[in-house]
């Protein structure tokens, strides 16, 4: 009995850790790496890195400041005290703009580093926990085996419609855009459109191949029900 409880508890603990481990790792590394990255960015003498979004935003801000400077030259009849305050305001705005750029740069480096570290840790954790994965796989297979063919076909149809259906490109666009943003990459409409138009097609081809090679051999009745629902 104790052995059975242990075999049940360990895979559940492993599953819980897989779900929450990325959050814990991300939080810990964000806190530990933030000060180090800030120091590196402040002391680094390398060239300033700007992605397309940051460059566009900063150029727009500087154009606004340039317009203000031109306005300053036009209104020469203003008292000297007013012009001095005007110059001080432009100087403060420029400093604030540089600070915003530095914060964006730190945020980009921090998130990219954290994501890479999380991926490495999760990969190593999954490789080392081979026994727990085998137990979880047996649970999933037993659960699927106990389902009726109708429920299986309905679940497959629902999943495929969500992932590769005619309305799925909007979801893929949001997901790919969020990944780009999370890794600090510039938003590129051409790359995102290319991925959205090709990735679901690749998934659809893989899924049809899986039905042809695996489901036709394991459960022909499930394939018949699936095609009936799909039609």
From Swiss-Prot:
Q: Topologically, how does it sit relative to the membrane?
A: Multi-pass membrane protein
Swiss-Prot/TrEMBL keywords: Antiport, Chloroplast, Hydrogen ion transport, Ion transport, Membrane, Plastid, Plastid inner membrane, Potassium, Potassium transport, Transmembrane, Transmembrane helix, Transport
Localization, UniProt? Plastid, Chloroplast inner membrane
GO terms (molecular function) for this protein are: antiporter activity; proton transmembrane transporter activity
Chain ranges passing through the membrane: 9-29, 116-136, 191-211
Principal place where this protein is found?
Answer: plastid
- Entries under Pfam families matching the protein: CemA
Q: Which GO terms describe its cellular component?
A: chloroplast inner membrane
Identify the domain of life: Eukaryota
Thylakoid listed as a keyword: no
What catalytic activity does the UniProt entry give for this protein?
K(+)(in) + H(+)(out) = K(+)(out) + H(+)(in)
* Example GO biological process: potassium ion transport
What family is this? Belongs to the CemA family.
Protein's job = Contributes to K(+)/H(+) antiport activity by supporting proton efflux to control proton extrusion and homeostasis in chloroplasts in a light-dependent manner to modulate photosynthesis. Prevents excessive induction of non-photochemical quenching (NPQ) under continuous-light conditions. Indirectly promotes efficient inorganic carbon uptake into chloroplasts.
Q: What is this protein called?
A: Potassium/proton antiporter CemA
Organism name: Manihot esculenta (Cassava)
Q: Which taxonomic lineage is given here?
A: Eukaryota, Viridiplantae, Streptophyta, Embryophyta, Tracheophyta
